[in-house]
Each structure stands twice: as structure tokens, then as C-alpha cells.
């Protein structure tokens, strides 16, 4: 397939206007304007060491000590993040009645904070902590109090923000860091997110695929799609013959599957969604779409 690449928004606006049941797949690029760093460079490679795996977190106390120490320092800023123009634009798309589903790979809940309701958090949510033993859950804000209680002085450390709500703590020893256990059963507590090496819950995947089957097009926003758990939805859309557009700087894993690729700021490219739709423009776009179908 020959991909249409543009540096401007009109082609994307036309793509959106001619579809009524968009399946939107969002990634870390949506939240960078909210102060949350992304993971990948323009070639799709890691900007920093790969995140902790599920197996290491569950199997090694030292990994949990390092993870929760970094999280203790990084959480306050992450928890204060607020939706940006991209989140509000996608909420406006839903308000227009053109959204089938917003499937987000992000764990920050900023889409919901912006007003989006038809959202599935593919990789879970960082504002909840889950016991891997008894399945009890608690708010991350409540767990922060336990972390600070058991580790006085750590909250005062300064460090650069990292993508997973943690912080880049360098030259710090974690051996004496105390990781609180589940208050109910003494089990291992883990953020309620899907780690690398961990499976996305089947029910969540099946719900997302059901919405994909009802969609008439796919729009990828702020994702390189390098993680298979998100990429597989674009693969399925391509097999079904759905038009696919991507709004993302740099290479994506799906470049050869795209109908349209826009390399522009997400907020700038989607700004038209926060303006009243132009009936003539919309009608023209849908007319041309019907003729080409």
C-alpha cells in the first residue's frame, strides 16, 4: 500500500469527517503535553531502559523495592497531570457522535478526566493498586501514604519524571526500602496495570475487538504501535479492509498498513474537533467516501 504522508491537518480532518464510527487507538504521544514523557524515539526504539517485566516484579523483592521507590518519588507529579488539548479533542469527537470506541494504551486516565466515556484502558490504570493474592484494590493515593509512612525522607528526593508515573532515581540504593504488603492478606501489591510479559485480560481484549467489528475506520493517535497488544487491533482492521490513519511523529509498526499518516503535533492536528463541524465540508467528505467505497 502507498501511504499518503502529510505534514498538515486537512487530510486528517477529511478522514475524520467521512467516518461515523471511528475506532481510536491512543498512545503515550497523547499525554506528553500533560508533562508525562513518552517511551519511544522517532525510529520506534526505547528512549530509556525497557520497563520492568511482570516476571521480575513478582519474583524479586529487589525489583519491587526499586519500582516502588521510583514510584513514590514520581507519583505526586504524575497524579497531578491534567488533560491537554488532545484529550479534549478526542472527547469532542465522542460528543459529535463519531466515536465507536477510544482504546487507550495509556494508564493515566486523562481521557476520562477530559470527559471521554466510551473508553477501554487496554493496559489498566495506574491510579489503582491491586493485591495479587486476594485481589483487593486500593487507590494509589492511599498507597502513597503507606509508602511515605514506611520510608521517611524518600518523598523529598528530586528526580526527573519517567513515563510510568515513576522517577529516574540514579545512584540510589534500594536495599532498605520498605515495600508495604497487602493490609488484608499480606500479599504482593502491584499497580493495576499490565506489565511487559503479562497478558491483557481476555474479557478486555474481546470487548475491544467487538467494537472494532462495529467500526468503519481506525485512527491511531500518538502511538508507534511497537507493542503487540495494541498493534494487533490495527492488523485486524487491515485484514477487515478498514481505512486506517495514524497521527504520530516518526515510524510506526503499521506504516505499511496505513491509508494516511500525519506527522504533526496531536493537539494541532486535532484542533478542528473543538470547532463546530462544517456541514458542507462533512457532506462533501462523506460523498467522496461513498463514491470510493
Curated annotation (Swiss-Prot):
Binds 1 zinc ion per subunit. InterPro entries: DHS-like_NAD/FAD-binding_dom, NAD-dep_sirtuin_deacylases, Sirtuin, Sirtuin_cat_small_dom_sf, Sirtuin_class_II, Ssirtuin_cat_dom. The keyword Nucleotide-binding does not apply. Its EC number is 2.3.1.286. It comes from the Bacteria. Zn(2+) binds at residues 131, 134, 182, 185. It catalyses: N(6)-acetyl-L-lysyl-[protein] + NAD(+) + H2O = 2''-O-acetyl-ADP-D-ribose + nicotinamide + L-lysyl-[protein]. GO terms for molecular function: histone deacetylase activity, NAD-dependent; NAD+ binding; zinc ion binding. The keyword Ribonucleoprotein does not apply. Its cofactor is Zn(2+). GO terms for cellular component: cytoplasm. The active site is at residue 123. NAD(+) binds at residues 27-47, 105-108, 222-224, 248-250, 266. It is found in: Cytoplasm. Disulfide bonds: none annotated. Signal peptide: none annotated. PANTHER family: NAD-DEPENDENT PROTEIN DEACYLASE SIRTUIN-5, MITOCHONDRIAL-RELATED. Belongs to the sirtuin family. Class II subfamily. This is NAD-dependent protein deacetylase. It comes from Xanthomonas campestris pv. campestris (strain ATCC 33913 / DSM 3586 / NCPPB 528 / LMG 568 / P 25).
Amino acid at each position: 500500500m502507498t501511504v499518503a504522508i502529510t505534514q498538515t491537518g486537512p487530510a486528517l480532518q477529511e478522514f475524520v469527517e467521512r467516518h461515523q464510527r471511528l475506532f481510536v487507538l491512543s498512545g503515550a504521544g497523547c499525554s506528553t503535553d500533560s508533562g508525562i514523557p513518552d517511551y519511544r524515539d522517532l525510529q520506534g526504539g526505547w528512549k530509556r531502559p525497557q520497563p520492568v517485566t511482570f516476571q521480575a516484579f513478582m519474583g524479586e523483592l529487589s525489583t519491587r523495592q526499586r519500582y516502588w521507590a521510583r514510584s513514590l518519588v514520581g507519583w505526586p507529579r504524575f497524579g497531578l497531570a491534567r488533560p491537554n488539548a488532545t484529550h479534549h479533542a478526542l472527547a469532542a469527537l465522542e460528543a459529535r457522535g463519531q466515536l465507536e470506541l477510544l482504546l487507550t494504551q495509556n494508564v493515566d486516565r486523562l481521557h476520562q478526566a477530559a470527559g471521554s466515556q466510551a473508553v477501554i484502558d487496554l493496559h489498566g490504570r495506574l491510579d489503582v493498586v491491586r493485591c495479587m493474592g486476594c485481589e483487593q484494590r486500593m487507590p494509589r493515593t492511599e498507597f502513597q501514604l503507606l509508602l511515605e509512612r514506611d520510608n521517611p525522607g524518600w518523598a523529598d528526593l528530586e528526580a526527573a519524571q519517567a513515563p510510568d508515573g515513576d522517577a529516574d532515581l540514579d545512584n540510589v540504593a534500594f536495599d532498605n526500602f520498605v515495600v508495604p504488603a497487602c493490609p488484608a492478606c499480606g500479599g504482593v501489591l502491584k499497580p493495576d496495570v499490565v506489565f511487559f510479559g503479562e497478558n491483557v485480560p481476555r474479557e478486555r481484549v474481546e470487548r475491544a475487538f467487538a467494537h472494532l467489528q462495529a467500526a468503519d475506520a481506525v485512527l491511531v493517535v500518538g502511538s508507534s504501535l511497537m507493542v503487540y497488544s495494541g498493534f494487533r487491533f490495527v492488523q485486524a482492521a487491515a485484514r477487515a479492509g478498514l481505512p486506517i490513519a495514524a497521527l504520530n511523529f516518526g515510524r510506526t509498526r503499521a506504516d505499511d498498513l496505513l491509508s494516511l499518516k500525519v506527522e504533526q503535533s496531536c493537539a494541532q492536528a486535532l484542533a478542528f474537533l473543538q470547532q463546530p463541524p462544517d456541514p458542507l465540508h462533512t457532506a462533501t467528505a462523506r460523498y467522496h467516501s461513498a463514491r470510493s467505497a
